[in-house]
Amino acid sequence: MAKFDEKKTLRCSFCGKSQDEVRRLVAGPGVYICDECVELCSEIISEEFEEEEYNEFDDRLPTPKEIKEFLDQYVVGQDHAKKILSVAVYNHYKRIYYHDNRKDDVEIQKSNILMLGPTGSGKTYLAQTLAKMLNVPFAIADATTLTEAGYVGEDVENILLRLIQNADYDIERAERGIVYIDEIDKIARKSDNPSITRDVSGEGVQQALLKILEGTIASVPPQGGRKHPHQEFIQIDTTNILFICGGAFEGIEKIIERRIGEKTLGFNAKIESKKEKKIGDILRQIMPQDLLKFGMIPEFIGRVPIIVTLDALDKEALIKILTEPKNALVKQYQKLFAMDGVELEFEKEALEAIADKAIERNTGARGLRAIMEEIMLDVMFEIPSNDKIEKVIITKAAVLKEDKPIVIINENKKVQRKPRLKQRLQERRGNVS
């Protein structure tokens, strides 16, 4: 019931304040509510809604353990790196939601990631797999193509254009994406002392990256290329974009060894083989001052506080990469052959020989596909033309090019092959006409 005093003054039905004591009184059928009570109700409902949404978000966002388990399905080894990445990514996306939905005096800053590891150790693949799991837009950029504004090359904003394109120009979605910047070690300045000469592809690029790494409203040319004053720009906030920078940082292990007191030269030098002292073990002892000595500027180091180190892949790890992950190369080729009704088998010695070749070429996991293509070329050329091929066995001799793969023919093989491409095209033309 609406409240009235003797002078018929209207009062709020909830707090009892008169219309003179509040800014506004809203009337309903037999009831009144003041602006203060409306605001209080709104806050209560909003808090409850936020709590429900936060709980839902907590259920949706995988825990660090779940993230690592997913990475384990696709990436062999690198357990230490996967653990650090899992925690970092979880905290990053938890921070985004918390900031979006709650007013708080404590602002949690973004923590970008720096990955160090030899070529082919899985840096790019780890970042790609994370984006796949979280279903967020993902873009890869090559730091060596970037130059600072005013010089020939790509502006740093073009990195963001790739992310926007991968998000189908949904800016809000792109603003929660992941950007992987490869070859970041190649933009180290030539010396750890500032130089009076201009370093447009080194220190200059590091300086240009600072703003987007930290968080800024960036103006991105929609067609890419250089900015000019008369074109329209896409505005994107980089505050919640996770940047993962990766590089081999060749030679940084010597800087680390010098710092921790290991002798690398001289008569009394401690001599250890690479097997005894793995580069990965040395890299784990990295400190910010080592990156500074390498040529990264202090401001850049400060914006990538999480450092992840990866181990070089040994023979055993490379064999596992060939066979164990969900999308392992051996499984991919077996599926390709199965499409033509052919079974594909790799002998154990053949897999070992493939791993040895990758180590010899110093290409890590990245070089495995190229080696496989070389081995399989002739067989893949013949199979589509011969319906009687039942099985192919890849031997060590085939990998070393001392012999051809073993091809087993079955004259009685019955194959229900899909219509040839030419036939299917003719059928499609007939249907259209």
Curated annotation (Swiss-Prot):
ATP binds at P118, T119, G120, S121, G122, K123, T124, Y125. GO terms for molecular function: ATP binding; ATP hydrolysis activity; ATP-dependent protein folding chaperone; protein dimerization activity; unfolded protein binding; zinc ion binding. Transmembrane segments: none annotated. It comes from the Bacteria. GO terms for cellular component: HslUV protease complex. It comes from Caldicellulosiruptor saccharolyticus (strain ATCC 43494 / DSM 8903 / Tp8T 6331). Keywords: ATP-binding, Chaperone, Metal-binding, Nucleotide-binding, Zinc. ATP-dependent specificity component of the Clp protease. It directs the protease to specific substrates. Can perform chaperone functions in the absence of ClpP. SUPFAM superfamilies: Glucocorticoid receptor-like (DNA-binding domain), P-loop containing nucleoside triphosphate hydrolases. This is ATP-dependent Clp protease ATP-binding subunit ClpX.
